[in-house]
Amino acid sequence: MKEKIKKFIPLFVVTALIFVILLGVVIVKVVQRYTPGKERVDINEYYNVNGSDAALIYNDVMTEDLVKVIDNNIYIDIDDVTSNFNQRFYWDSYEGLLIYTTDKDVIKAYAGTKEYTVSGQKNNTEYDIVKIDGQNVYVALDYIKKYTKIDYEYYENPGRLYLYSVDGTYQTVKAKKKSVIRRKGGIKSLIVADVKKGEELKIIEEIDGWTKVKTEDGYI
């Protein structure tokens, strides 16, 4: 009888150890599953920017298009201008001339100059109105704004241009505690930026129980 008890005790101990190990594995997996991820995005890769380029975010929607920042002036590709928010701009590639027409005037600006004419009358800016880079034609944002109803916000490191062509109100919410915003919904998604307690966040949209927001320093 004593021999049976002696054999039973080691077997019980081994079984208990296996149970404890399995329980520990389960606990670790549960903790890992519900612990928020700490890995961050490569912010330049996230916004697809490099060098003097800046990301173009149009009406709070990220695009694959880029804008140029040259001598502290922002330049937008003419194709993005005409396709997104002002079809009245026309680029004459033969003459190297940007043309804009209204009911009363014809406005012209040659590439690489700070001068433009309004129905023949000369005017000047402090920047080159049109820049050419290979096959691409870029127009200064400040010049575009003269004839286009748009608002914009620009942020650095990395460069991000938020263009708004629509009016309207939007909701905001204040962060109740220090937090982060993530690339996608889910606690394991990569971190894009930190959020301070009390920071005002612009609500963009609700997605599957998660809220897409824009931070005060221009991250979405």
Model region roles, listed by residue range:
Residues 2-207:
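Primary recognition of N-terminal secretory signal peptides and signal-anchoring hydrophobic helices
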Residues 173-176, 215-220:
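A short macromolecule-binding patch
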Residues 208-212:
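Short aromatic-glycine-enriched beta-strand elements
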Residues 160, 213-214:
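Sparse recognition of residues in long alpha-helices and their boundaries
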